[in-house]
Amino acid sequence: MISNSEYHKEYMKGTTTVGLLCNDGVVLATDKRATMGNLIADKEAKKLYKIDDYIAMTIAGSVGDAQSLIRLISAEAKIYKMRTGNNMTPLSCTTLISNVLHGNRHYPLLTQLILGGYDLINGAKLFSLDPVGGINEESSFTATGSGSPTAYGVLESEYKSDIAIEKGLLIAVKALSSAMQRDAYSGNGISLAHINKDGVKLYSDAEIEGFLKKINRKR
């Protein structure tokens, strides 16, 4: 029988996620590898989720905890829209998630989250949340997971204020690509999205491959 502490060491974990604030929206990116100890448990793990028409979120940490939270928040966003006729704002969604996480602080959900969204009044917003509900509103970029030190190296050197989404997409892909080369717990491809005044766009594998080719040509 596995003890509770041993279980926490062995749960499926997501690893590298990135968020960038751009002048016309937000970019989010994740790798696709989930690990359980030294085992690659999933090569197609979903770590990037569309929550609402103008909100998306990345997960790192316990996949089960994060998926449970995603289901709850997605349902709450739909109920909010049905009742009010409006989409939940990124700040409101982040506050709701924070309250849920803080309510479980004695038995915390083992996950780190990045939430990106577009408020039709206040523009693009980027937030990060810790496992007990702490909120940081990011003014530039953020990264989570075991590959984040490498990703931060790329973000620090490449990111400039007031970049457009097109440039932000390339930086995010480059940061994830570098993390996957250096971190054993990151890999197996990239998930990518941007959020702007037109809503959430999730990129296909073919489109992401096109970004990787552009990056490689510049090296």
UniProtKB/Swiss-Prot annotation:
Give the EC number(s) listed in the UniProt record.
Answer: 3.4.25.1
The signal peptide stretch is none
Tell me the Gene3D superfamilies matching this sequence. Answer: Glutamine Phosphoribosylpyrophosphate, subunit 1, domain 1 (3.60.20.10)
UniProt xrefs under Pfam families = Proteasome
Highest rank taxon of the organism: Archaea
* Subcellular location(s) of the protein: Cytoplasm
Which GO terms fall under biological process for this protein?
proteasomal protein catabolic process
Molecular function terms from GO: threonine-type endopeptidase activity
The record's principal subcellular location, in a coarse class, is cytoplasm
The UniProt keywords, alphabetically, are:
Autocatalytic cleavage, Cytoplasm, Hydrolase, Protease, Proteasome, Threonine protease, Zymogen
Question: What is the activity-regulation note?
Answer: The formation of the proteasomal ATPase PAN-20S proteasome complex, via the docking of the C-termini of PAN into the intersubunit pockets in the alpha-rings, triggers opening of the gate for substrate entry. Interconversion between the open-gate and close-gate conformations leads to a dynamic regulation of the 20S proteasome proteolysis activity.
- Which parts of this protein are propeptide? 1-14
Active-site residues, as the UniProt record annotates them: 15
Q: Please write the reaction equations for the catalytic activity of this protein.
A: Cleavage of peptide bonds with very broad specificity
The family database entries (InterPro entries) matched by this protein are listed as: Ntn_hydrolases_N (IPR029055), Pept_T1A_Psome_bsu_arc (IPR019983), Pept_T1A_subB (IPR000243), Proteasome_bsu_CS (IPR016050), Proteasome_sua/b (IPR001353), Proteasome_suB-type (IPR023333)
Instruction: Note whether Translocase occurs among the keywords.
Output: no
Q: What does the protein in this record do?
A: Component of the proteasome core, a large protease complex with broad specificity involved in protein degradation.
**Which NCBIfam families does the UniProt entry name for this protein?**
arc_protsome_B
The family annotation for this protein states:
Belongs to the peptidase T1B family.
Q: How does it assemble?
A: The 20S proteasome core is composed of 14 alpha and 14 beta subunits that assemble into four stacked heptameric rings, resulting in a barrel-shaped structure. The two inner rings, each composed of seven catalytic beta subunits, are sandwiched by two outer rings, each composed of seven alpha subunits. The catalytic chamber with the active sites is on the inside of the barrel. Has a gated structure, the ends of the cylinder being occluded by the N-termini of the alpha-subunits. Is capped at one or both ends by the proteasome regulatory ATPase, PAN.
Q: What is this protein called?
A: Proteasome subunit beta
In its UniProt entry, the species of origin is given as Methanococcus maripaludis (strain DSM 14266 / JCM 13030 / NBRC 101832 / S2 / LL)
